[in-house]
Regions:
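Periplasmic-binding protein-like
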Residues: 1-7, 123-146
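Soluble non-cytosolic domains of exported or imported proteins
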Residues: 8-9, 25, 44-47, 62, ...
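Solvent-exposed, polar/charged alpha-helical surfaces in well-ordered, non-transmembrane soluble domains
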Residues: 32, 47, 51, 55, ...
Length: 183
C-alpha cells in the first residue's frame, strides 16, 4: 500500500468517514491494517501514489479521481503509460458507497457584500459553472453529469455521510492515525 501522510485533509476526511461507519474500534483496525501494509513511508501527493502503483512500487493506493483526470488530460506519453498501468476501482459499491471529498463555498457572516456572494454561489451551482469546473479541474460535478476526461471513469455510488459529520470527527480521526502508526 502506498499512501499520503495521515496529516493530509483527504486522509483525515476518509478516516472520519470510516470512523462514522465502523466506529472507533473498526476504524482503528482499518488504520492499523493499512499502516501495517505500507510498501514505503507515506509521502507525496495523489499523483505520486498513482505513479507508484503504475511502477509496481506498491499494489494499491487511494487517490482522488481528479488526479487521474489530470493524467488522462495531459497528453504526455509517460502519463498515458501511468494510466495504462493502473486499474481504477470505486470501493464500497454494494453498501455505503465510495467516500468523496468536496469543494465547497460559503458566505461568512461578516461578508461586506452578501447578496453578490450568494449570487456567485448560485452561479457556481449552475449547469454552465459545474461543466466548467468539472472540465477545468477534472472533478465530478455536484450537479449534472461529468464531462471531460473524468467522464471516462463512469459513475459510482457515493457515500452519503454529511461533510459536517466529517468535520466533527476530524480530531478523533487524527488520534486514530497516530495510534495506528500512520505518519
Amino acid at each position: 500500500v502506498c499512501m499520503r501522510s495521515s496529516g493530509n485533509i483527504y486522509n483525515i476526511s476518509l478516516m472520519a468517514s470510516v470512523l462514522e461507519v465502523a466506529g472507533a474500534e473498526g476504524a482503528a483496525n482499518w488504520a492499523k491494517g493499512v499502516a501495517s501494509n505500507f510498501a514505503r513511508d507515506p509521502q507525496s501527493n495523489d499523483t505520486g501514489q498513482i505513479r507508484a502503483v503504475a511502477s509496481g512500487e506498491c499494489k494499491v493506493s487511494i487517490a482522488n479521481t481528479y488526479y487521474i483526470g489530470r493524467l488522462l488530460a495531459s497528453g504526455k506519453p509517460e502519463d498515458k503509460a501511468v494510466i495504462d498501468g493502473i486499474r481504477i476501482v470505486f470501493p464500497n459499491q454494494s453498501d455505503r458507497g465510495t467516500h468523496v471529498n468536496i469543494s465547497g463555498a460559503g458566505v461568512v457572516a461578516s461578508a461586506p457584500n452578501k447578496e453578490n456572494a450568494i449570487k456567485f454561489i448560485e452561479y457556481l451551482t449552475s449547469d454552465e459553472a459545474q461543466r466548467i469546473f468539472a472540465e477545468g479541474n477534472n472533478e465530478y460535478p455536484v450537479i449534472g453529469e461529468a464531462t471531460g476526461p473524468i467522464s471516462t471513469l463512469g459513475s459510482f455510488n457515493e457515500d452519503q455521510i454529511s461533510a459536517s459529520i466529517l468535520g466533527v470527527r476530524q480530531k478523533e480521526a487524527v488520534e486514530l492515525f497516530d495510534q495506528a502508526g500512520w505518519l
